[in-house]
Amino acid sequence: MPGAAAKGSELSERIESFVETLKRGGGRRTSEDMARETLGLLRRLITDHHWNNAGDLMDLIRREGRRMTAAHPPETTVGNMVRRVLKIIREEYGRLHGRSDESDQQESLHKLLTSGGLSEDFSFHYAPLKSNIIEAINELLVELEGTTENIAAQALEHIHSNEVIMTIGFSRTVEAFLREAAQKRKFHVIAAECAPFCQGHEMAVNLSEAGIETTVMTDAAIFAVMSRVNKVIIGTKTILANGSLRAVAGTHTLALAAKHHSTPLIVCAPMFKLSPQFPSEEDSFHKFVAPEEVLPFTEGDILEKVSVHCPVFDYVPPDLITLFISNIGGNAPSYVYRLMSELYHPDDHVL
């Protein structure tokens, strides 16, 4: 069928284009954009490709998912969305196969630990499976649309009048959170500039335009100012499996200062940033960029004598974090393992 061939060719080009974008670091796209685009491509894969049963479909999704994640391992959102789709396929197949939802939801610790050794037969064919999966993916896309608004809606529960809030760098989620609180509360924000990228300046400008009293400071002043701060509110790139963070460089310093002064540290992050990865996975954790901002290339004499690294991310241990605020509510870092079991199947942690 020429129509099907044309569709397949167009889809292959779109996936190839997305993979090339990932290889270049994703450009100016946000994690939410990446999540939405990944889901859109996977939905097209499910509708356009011919598959006979859930097993065939999961193999297809895994194959394309590995290709996407390998293009740029630090962009964990892509892999997270692939795992969410695999979980959806398992759930929809289970419903048609006659497995009860209750047995899935109330998993014992023993079942969570041993599920990797059990295998389920996905070879049965069910006609409604495709439409059910597409409907579930559409619901997930709708959920993605409202993640920032759902997080911002909780702002008044955490920010009170005349408080001093500290943040670092630029986060759209944190900006929306603070803007929402500013509609009914008056407070002061201190933004660490997050050198060498200095995204804190962009955050300060945006908050000032919203009528929020904002001060920018250097990263070196974080500890000195922390004694005046009531709360630290930050965003993150990834929430790791042990409840720790992969956040912008400088966040670990901020978290240590907050811990020393017993200042609560709140992390605003949607659920699609929750990843089953651990900090030991170096390929996907670390990301380095050109150190020109730290040590300009014009300093030729010095450059000959030193080796300079400019990491983009910091590791923040879970014991430095007070609370996660996501689109489904607030949770302590110790609860992350439970959220993980609700979002991803243990067999899909490694694609």
Curated annotation (Swiss-Prot):
It is found in: Cytoplasm, Cytosol. Component of the translation initiation factor 2B (eIF2B) complex which is a heterodecamer of two sets of five different subunits: alpha, beta, gamma, delta and epsilon. Subunits alpha, beta and delta comprise a regulatory subcomplex and subunits epsilon and gamma comprise a catalytic subcomplex. Within the complex, the hexameric regulatory complex resides at the center, with the two heterodimeric catalytic subcomplexes bound on opposite sides. Belongs to the eIF-2B alpha/beta/delta subunits family. Gene3D superfamilies: Translation initiation factor eif-2b, domain 2. InterPro entries: eIF2B_beta_subunit, IF-2B-related, IF_2B-like_C, NagB/RpiA_transferase-like. It comes from Rattus norvegicus. The keyword Protein biosynthesis applies. Its main location: cytoplasm. Keywords: Cytoplasm, Initiation factor, Protein biosynthesis. GO terms for cellular component: axon; cytoplasm; cytosol; endoplasmic reticulum; eukaryotic translation initiation factor 2B complex; glycinergic synapse; postsynapse. GO terms for molecular function: ATP binding; GTP binding; guanyl-nucleotide exchange factor activity; translation initiation factor activity. Activated by the chemical integrated stress response (ISR) inhibitor ISRIB which stimulates guanine nucleotide exchange factor activity for both phosphorylated and unphosphorylated eIF2. Pfam families: IF-2B. Acts as a component of the translation initiation factor 2B (eIF2B) complex, which catalyzes the exchange of GDP for GTP on eukaryotic initiation factor 2 (eIF2) gamma subunit. Its guanine nucleotide exchange factor activity is repressed when bound to eIF2 complex phosphorylated on the alpha subunit, thereby limiting the amount of methionyl-initiator methionine tRNA available to the ribosome and consequently global translation is repressed. This is Translation initiation factor eIF2B subunit beta. GO terms for biological process: central nervous system development; cytoplasmic translational initiation; hippocampus development; myelination; oligodendrocyte development; ovarian follicle development; positive regulation of axon extension; response to glucose.
